[in-house]
Curated annotation (Swiss-Prot):
The gene is csm6. GO terms for biological process: defense response to virus. GO terms for molecular function: endonuclease activity. Homodimer; the composite ssRNase active site is formed at the dimer interface. Residues 1-155 are annotated as: CARF domain. This is CRISPR system endoribonuclease Csm6. Non-specific ssRNase activity is allosterically activated by cyclic hexaadenylate (cA6) binding to its CARF domain. cA6 is a second messenger produced by Cas10 of the ternary Csm effector complex in the presence of a cognate target RNA. Belongs to the CRISPR-associated Csm6 family. It is an enzyme of class 3 (hydrolase). Residues 156-430 are annotated as: HEPN domain.
Length: 430
């Protein structure tokens, strides 16, 4: 089944003794059903044009398509030159046609009516292209409709015979248009929006759906490589080239970039869970750099070297004892033989350096530790408004970058913006 949905303008049903766009589509596509849309002003007319209600639309259409079913819709449009005025109305009518005739092919007349109507139908096609076709009809002289002789209702029967005679000797002026450039422009903007939100998988799916996309193969390759790197926590090739032979810096910088990406796109719970682990790794590098041999490794696990400094060992034991006052449990050197983590590193630096930039930033990470444990281990939901949790998480993410720069001062500021630079490179290919 074929259905034609057609707005009607002042150049319908004919002009200069030749078909208007709607009638020409009916003539050459022979639809089973035609839905005509009139604004009330077009239907009623004004001092310049007699209203379209004066024409016998059923008789005109059935003169060239005898068994065609015709439905007329007339609506009051308050602001006819508003591009949004027809969006919901046209969509509603087309949804109704699809629901009543699910297997029908719907032709959209994008030549008749106002520019606002034509654009709305083009957008409808771009958004919901399934089983729809946009039909454009050129003028007989392939020029505009300026200075044309409009149809007159009072002599429509005679004029219709003349029009049918003229058109019987002429080829079709209909053209199916895919509006690929229009559709691609919308898709490109959607992809750019996804890139701005770091939603690379959705961007890749959208690019893959556009077979004729300019630079599509290259864009898909770059997105796929980045997605795999993020999923597998592989260091970006850019970072490897930028900092060769410094694997620890590469890893710390990669995870800091990913942490900031997750925070910026709103993955707050994921950010909260990861921030302490990344901070722990960075602080471990700081201690190795500034206090060599304080940490020893057993099967790649970090332990406190109690032989590093008797003063530090005694101070650390005293600190542990002060925290165990309620249990009266005394710590011994043997009890310090356990895997180290962020809390222990924080204690060491507070004992060794008192207050400095590193310990201050560590405190910001430590401030969200209880919240992190509730989310990560108790599977609690996250309330950003309670106890200023949102601000505390932001402060912790910022602290990780500051800590990284304290350990690896050679890192450049623009390295943190690698993903934004990647996004821009994809946008340029688009």
């Amino acid at each position: 089944m074929k259905i034609l949905f057609s707005p009607i303008g002042n150049t319908d049903p004919w002009r200069n003794d030749r078909d208007g766009a709607m009638l020409h589509i009916v003539r050459h596509y022979q639809p089973d059903r035609v839905v005509l849309f009139f604004t009330e002003s077009i239907w009623q007319g004004n001092q310049h044009f007699s209203g379209q209600q004066a024409f016998d639309w059923v008789k005109i259409i059935q003169s060239i398509n005898e068994n065609c079913q015709i439905e007329i819709k007339c609506d009051t449009i308050e602001v006819e030159n508003d591009f949004d005025a027809y969006k919901d109305l046209f969509h509603q009518y087309l949804v109704e046609e699809k629901r009543k005739y699910p297997n029908a092919e719907i032709f959209l007349n994008v030549t008749s009516g106002t520019p606002q109507m034509e654009t709305t139908l083009c957008l409808e096609y771009v958004t919901y292209p399934d089983k729809m076709r946009c039909i454009q009809v050129s003028t007989p002289l392939k020029t505009s409709n300026a200075k044309t002789k409009y149809a007159q209702a009072d002599c429509q029967e005679v004029d219709l015979e003349i029009v049918n005679e003229e058109e019987s000797q002429q080829p079709s002026r209909c053209h199916k248009i895919a509006i690929l450039s229009f559709r691609e422009a919308i898709v490109r903007n959607q992809i750019k929006s996804l890139l701005d939100n770091y939603d690379y998988e959705a961007a890749l799916q959208l690019v893959a759906s556009q077979k004729s996309f300019r630079n599509g193969k290259e864009i898909r390759k770059k997105l796929k490589e980045l997605i795999d790197d993020i999923k597998m926590h592989r260091v970006f090739s850019y970072l490897i080239k930028q900092y060769p032979r410094n694997e620890k810096l590469q890893k710390a910088l990669l995870h800091t970039i990913l942490l900031e990406m997750r925070h910026q796109r709103g993955d707050i719970a994921e950010t909260l869970i990861r921030v302490k682990s990344i901070a722990e790794y960075i602080v471990e590098q700081y201690i190795q750099k500034n206090y060599p041999y304080l940490i020893i490794y057993k099967e790649d696990k970090p332990y406190f070297n109690v032989s590093y400094s008797q003063e530090l060992t005694e101070s650390y034991l005293a600190l542990m004892d002060s925290r165990n006052k309620k249990t009266n449990k005394k710590m011994t050197v043997d009890s310090l033989d356990r895997i180290l983590g962020f809390p222990a590193y924080r204690d060491f630096l507070q004992l060794l350096e008192a207050s400095n930039e590193m310990t201050n930033e560590m405190n910001k990470v430590n401030e969200i530790n209880n919240l992190r444990n509730k989310v990560a281990h108790n599977l609690d939901s996250l309330n950003l408004d309670r106890d200023k949790n949102g601000r505390k998480i932001t402060n912790a993410v910022t602290a990780v970058r500051t800590m990284l720069l304290a350990v690896f001062p050679e890192v450049q500021e623009n390295d943190f913006h690698y993903l934004k630079q990647f996004n821009q490179s994809i946008k340029e290919l688009l």
